[in-house]
Amino acid sequence: MKALVLAGGSGTRLRPITHTQAKQLVPVANKPVLFYGLESIAEAGIREVGIVVGDTHAEIEAAVGDGSRFGLQATYLRQEAPLGLAHAVLIARDYLGDDDFVMYLGDNFIVGGIEGLAERFRARRPSAQIMLTRVSDPRQFGVAELDANGRVVGLEEKPREPKSDLALVGVYLFTPAIHDAVAELKPSWRGELEITDAIQWLIDSGHDVEPSVISGYWKDTGNVADMLEVNRLVLESSEPRIDGDVEDCEIIGRVVVEAGASVRRSRVVGPVVIGAGTVITGSYVGPFTSIGADCVVSGSEIEYSIVLSRASIQGVRRIEASLIGHDVEVTPAPETPRAHRLVLGDHSRVQISS
């Protein structure tokens, strides 16, 4: 079995962060989202992975390399334009050959990984196995319709009137039968080759398509709110570790201070992770905050936020529920609001009331 990881797309819902960074490389708990998926694939016993890349291919390739750090062998497949999930399968046809494969969306996060899903697929080997979860607003997703016996009878991409609340999670397992389905597709009204149409073709052609409804946590980290929520979830399971320098501080709960970091005269309430080389002085860092490497936080309060590497936050009364990019400077401005809620792209310069 191989894996096909989709790491293209423009990440419009995470702009301005993704103007300068691939969305799959935005970190959660100081580790890129894509890396969690690659680790899950390796844990499922898969060793060969094709990574579909677009305009950010150089950045993705530099981060992942040959895949050996994950126990994988990575091959990069260039998709010139984001023309749908089924189009990614189409351009990967030669790479996939006659192997079964798992298709994994690189900006998705699934608690517990995919090992159990892969084991079930290997044992039963349906033509397709789709991962489903119940959502409050299925209109934003591909939606599956099941019959009274729990069999998949229909799929629809982002329907105006959903027939169920079962959304397709960004993990699919296929036999080579999917290639016959993709070959028959025509572009949808969105101008894309839809994987839901390909799976529907399998259903209509009498192939076995099995659902797997997950009860665990899944998020598409394509927007800031979901990114912050996944960051919260990962930090909740972190183990406390103090490898850096801590002086005259109050440290409470699950706090990670990486080697080379310095925290002085501050209060840190976990779960929190503080990256290598970061200096925090006279500040409060509250729960569910990730601060990347080589940052400066001085005389400020921050909580429930993600701060990327080399950012500087100085003299700011309070920041919460924010995603702050690389090399950002946040400093006081004359007036003082109660709190600041920010999404700042790399190299931004922002003045904020203190």
State what each model feature region is.
Residues 1-5, 13-16, 26-27, 31-105, ...:
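Conserved N-terminal catalytic core of the sugar/cofactor nucleotidyltransferase
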Residues 9, 107, 134, 223:
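Active-site glycine-centered loops adjacent to acidic/histidine catalytic or metal-binding residues
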Residues 24, 73-75, 151, 208-210:
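Conserved beta-strand segments of alpha/beta enzyme cores
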Residues 25, 144-146, 211:
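A structural signal for short hydrophobic beta-strand segments in well-ordered beta-sheet cores
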Residues 50-54, 131-132, 306, 323:
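Short internal beta-strands
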Residues 55, 173-174, 222:
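A conserved hydrophobic position in a structured secondary element of the catalytic/binding core
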Residues 110-189:
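Conserved core of the sugar-phosphate nucleotidyltransferase
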Residues 177, 184-354:
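Left-handed beta-helix
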